[in-house]
C-alpha cells in the first residue's frame, strides 16, 4: 500500500473529527493497515513527516495513542492524482481515482475540471506577468531523436521544425519552394548553385547565422554514415563558403529538385560552433527536456516574428494516445467550435518481397489485395478513416479482374504458413491490424500480429523479419517528396521491402527525375512507379485519414502542419 492509501484507511477507522485528537492503540493501527506493529510505527512516522497527522504516543503497552488527522483524504487523493498526471503517470492517476470512486463520488469531476484548466490552451499568471501556454500529453518515444537527419517519426519532424529552420519552405498553394533562411539563389549552369543568406538571423544562443553553419550542416549530412536521407543532396560533391552570407554547392550531376529538397526539415541548419546540438534558429527554443517533460519557449528574436504562444509544455506519458491531443481549450469556459482537417497521410501495407515465403507468389499477394478491401475497412472500422485509396498518387482507383481470392490462394500453393504483420502499438494501428487479421482468418490465412515501439521498427533486422508492415506515409503538402521518401529513404519500410525488379526500376526512373526541371513531368514518372508498384503488389494502400480539431472559439490560427500536428507558430488566444 502507498502512504496515501494508509492514510485513507486510518481516517476511515479512527477519525471522528479532523484536527481533533482521536485515540487508537498500536494494535488497532496495525490491524487497520494489515501489517506488523513495527511497520505500523514506521508508517505513522512517515505520516508525521508529511504533516498529515499529529501523534501523541501512549505510555506503556496497550495504551492508546492520540492521533489528529490534519488533511481530508479527498484533498490528498486529488493532489496525488495531479502529481501523477504532471509526471506523465496517467494510468496511475486513473487507477487511484477509480479505487476511491465510491468513497468520494465527486473526486473524478474535480480532477476532470483541473485537467481542463491546466491542459490545452491556458493563460497563467506568474512573477513575469501573464503567459499563454499550450500544455499537451505526448508519448516519450515521440521525441526519441531531435537530430534532423535522424528523424523517423512524424512527431520528431514536427519538433525539429519548431527548433530549427531550413533554407527554403514549401509553398503549398504555389506548389514550389519559397525563400526562408535565404533571400535569393541562382543556378550557374546545371551543376552549380549559390544561396544567399538573410542577415540578422540569430541562433537561440545569440550567435548569428552564417555560411559556415550552412556548410557545416550540409557536410555533416553527407558524411554521417547512418544518415538514411542522403538522396536529398543528390549529386552534391562539394560545399563552399563564398563569404559570410553565401554558400555554393558543386554537383557532379544535375539536380533540378535541389530547392525542393532544401525545404525538408532533415536539412535544417545546425550551428557549426556546437557541432550540432539543439540550438537552432527556429520559432521556439528548448527550455528543458528530461524524462518527464519537454518545454519549448518562444524565441523572442525570431527573424519572421515572435510566436504568439509564450510556452509549450509536452508532458510525457505512455497513455498519451488515450488523451485527445487535439482538444485545445482555454481556462475560461467558452463555447466550443469544431474544425475538421483532411489529412494527406496514406495508411498502407508494405509487403516484404525480399523475404522467402507465400508473399513471393503474386497470386497470394493478389488474394490479399482482394480480401483487404479499402472500402470495407473504412466502412467497418470507421473513426478517423475517411477516403479509401488503391494507390499513393493516382486519382482514379485501380480495378482488379474478377478472380476469387480462394482461387488465387489455391493457385499460389498456400498451405497455411504463418504470415507476420508488424506495426506500431498505437490504437489506430492496432485496430487496422486486428481487422486485417480477422478478414484473413475468415479465408484460412494465418496472420499473427506484432505490435512494436518505434525503437524496434527503426531496426533493419526487425523490418526484414516482417512479412508485412502497416504504416502511414505523409503526402500533406508536397506529394512529390512524400512519395520520394517512401522510395529513396533508407529507413522507409517500402524501400527495404521492394523487390529487386522494382528497386532497379525505381533507381533508374528517379535518377531521370533529378535532371527534369518540369514538375509535371516528374509527377508523371512517380505515377508510373506508383502504378507498377501497385500492379506488382509490393504495397497495399488502404485509406486517408481525417483529423478532427476541437477548440473554444477564442482559440485562433488553428492550422495543422504536414505531420498532422498543430502549427505552434500560428496559434493564438483572443481575450
Swiss-Prot record:
Region (Solute-binding region): 176-490
Gene Ontology biological-process annotations: peptide transport
Superkingdom in the source lineage: Bacteria
One annotated GO molecular function: peptide transmembrane transporter activity
Gene3D superfamilies recorded: Dipeptide-binding Protein, Domain 3, Periplasmic binding protein-like II
InterPro entries on file: SBP_5, SBP_5_dom, SgrR_HTH_N
Keyword DNA-binding: yes
Annotation: DNA-binding region: 26-49
One Pfam match: SgrR_N
PANTHER family cross-referenced by the UniProt entry: HTH-TYPE TRANSCRIPTIONAL REGULATOR SGRR, PERIPLASMIC BINDING COMPONENT OF ABC TRANSPORTER
Protein family according to the UniProt entry: In the C-terminal section; belongs to the bacterial solute-binding protein 5 family.
Listed name of the protein: Uncharacterized protein YhjP
Organism per entry: Bacillus subtilis (strain 168)
Lineage of the species this protein comes from: Bacteria, Bacillati, Bacillota, Bacilli, Bacillales
Recorded name of the encoding gene: yhjP
Amino acid at each position: 500500500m502507498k502512504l496515501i492509501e494508509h492514510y485513507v484507511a486510518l481516517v476511515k477507522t479512527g477519525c471522528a473529527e479532523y484536527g481533533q485528537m482521536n485515540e487508537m492503540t498500536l494494535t488497532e493501527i496495525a490491524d487497520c493497515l494489515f501489517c506488523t506493529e513495527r511497520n505500523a510505527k514506521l508508517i505513522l512516522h512517515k505520516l508525521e513527516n508529511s504533516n498529515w497527522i499529529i501523534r501523541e504516543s501512549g505510555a506503556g503497552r496497550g495504551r492508546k495513542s492520540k492521533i489528529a488527522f490534519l488533511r481530508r483524504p479527498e484533498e490528498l487523493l486529488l493532489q496525488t492524482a495531479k502529481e501523477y498526471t504532471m509526471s506523465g503517470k496517467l494510468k496511475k492517476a486513473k487507477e487511484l481515482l477509480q479505487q476511491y470512486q465510491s468513497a468520494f463520488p465527486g473526486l473524478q469531476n474535480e480532477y476532470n475540471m483541473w485537467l481542463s484548466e491546466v491542459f490545452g490552451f491556458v493563460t497563467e499568471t506568474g512573477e513575469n506577468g501573464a503567459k499563454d501556454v499550450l500544455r499537451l500529453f505526448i508519448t516519450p518515444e515521440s521525441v526519441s531523436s531531435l537530430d534532423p537527419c535522424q528523424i523517423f517519426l512524424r512527431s520528431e519532424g514536427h519538433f525539429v521544425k519548431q527548433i530549427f529552420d531550413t533554407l527554403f519552405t514549401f509553398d503549398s498553394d504555389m506548389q514550389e519552394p519559397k525563400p526562408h533562411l535565404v533571400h535569393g539563389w541562382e543556378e550557374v549552369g546545371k551543376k552549380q548553385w549559390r544561396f544567399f543568406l538573410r542577415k540578422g538571423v540569430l541562433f537561440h544562443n545569440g550567435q548569428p547565422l552564417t555560411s559556415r553553419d550552412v556548410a557545416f550542416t550540409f557536410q555533416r549530412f553527407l558524411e554521417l554514415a547512418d544518415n538514411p536521407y542522403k538522396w536529398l543532396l543528390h549529386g552534391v560533391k562539394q560545399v563552399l563558403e563564398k563569404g559570410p552570407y553565401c554558400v555554393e554547392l558543386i554537383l557532379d550531376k544535375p539536380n533540378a529538385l535541389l530547392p525542393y529538397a532544401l525545404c525538408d526539415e532533415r536539412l535544417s541548419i545546425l550551428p557549426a560552433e556546437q557541432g550540432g546540438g539543439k540550438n537552432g534558429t527556429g520559432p521556439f527554443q528548448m527550455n528543458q527536456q528530461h524524462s518527464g517533460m519537454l518545454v519549448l519557449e518562444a524565441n523572442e528574436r525570431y527573424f519572421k516574428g515572435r510566436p504568439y504562444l509564450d510556452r509549450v509544455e509536452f508532458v510525457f506519458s505512455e497513455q498519451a494516445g488515450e488523451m485527445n491531443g487535439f482538444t485545445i481549450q482555454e481556462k475560461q469556459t467558452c463555447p466550443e467550435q469544431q474544425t475538421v482537417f483532411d489529412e494527406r497521410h496514406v495508411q498502407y501495407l508494405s509487403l516484404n518481397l525480399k523475404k522467402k515465403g507465400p508473399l513471393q507468389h503474386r497470386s497470394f499477394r493478389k488474394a490479399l489485395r482482394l480480401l483487404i478491401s479499402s472500402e470495407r475497412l473504412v466502412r467497418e472500422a470507421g473513426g478517423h478513416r475517411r477516403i479509401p485509396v488503391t494507390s499513393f498518387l493516382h486519382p482514379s482507383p485501380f480495378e482488379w479482374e474478377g478472380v476469387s481470392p480462394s482461387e488465387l490462394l489455391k493457385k499460389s500453393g498456400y498451405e497455411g504458413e504463418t504470415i507476420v504483420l508488424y506495426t506500431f502499438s498505437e490504437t489506430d494501428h492496432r485496430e487496422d491490424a486486428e481487422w486485417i487479421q480477422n478478414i484473413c482468418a475468415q479465408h484460412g490465412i494465418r496472420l499473427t500480429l506484432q505490435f512494436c515501439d518505434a525503437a524496434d521498427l527503426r531496426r533493419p533486422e526487425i523490418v526484414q523479419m516482417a512479412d508485412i508492415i502497416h504504416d502511414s506515409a505523409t503526402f500533406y503538402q508536397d506529394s512529390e517528396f512524400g512519395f520520394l521518401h517512401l522510395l529513396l529513404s533508407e529507413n522507409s519500410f517500402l524501400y527495404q521491402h521492394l523487390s529487386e525488379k522494382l528497386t532497379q526500376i525505381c533507381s533508374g526512373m528517379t535518377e531521370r527525375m533529378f535532371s527534369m526541371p518540369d514538375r509535371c513531368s516528374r509527377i508523371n514518372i512517380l505515377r508510373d512507379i506508383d502504378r507498377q508498384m501497385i500492379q506488382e503488389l509490393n504495397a497495399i494502400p488502404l485509406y486517408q485519414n481525417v483529423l478532427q480539431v476541437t477548440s473554444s472559439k477564442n482559440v485562433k490560427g488553428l492550422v495543422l502542419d504536414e505531420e498532422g500536428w498543430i502549427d505552434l507558430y500560428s496559434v493564438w488566444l483572443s481575450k
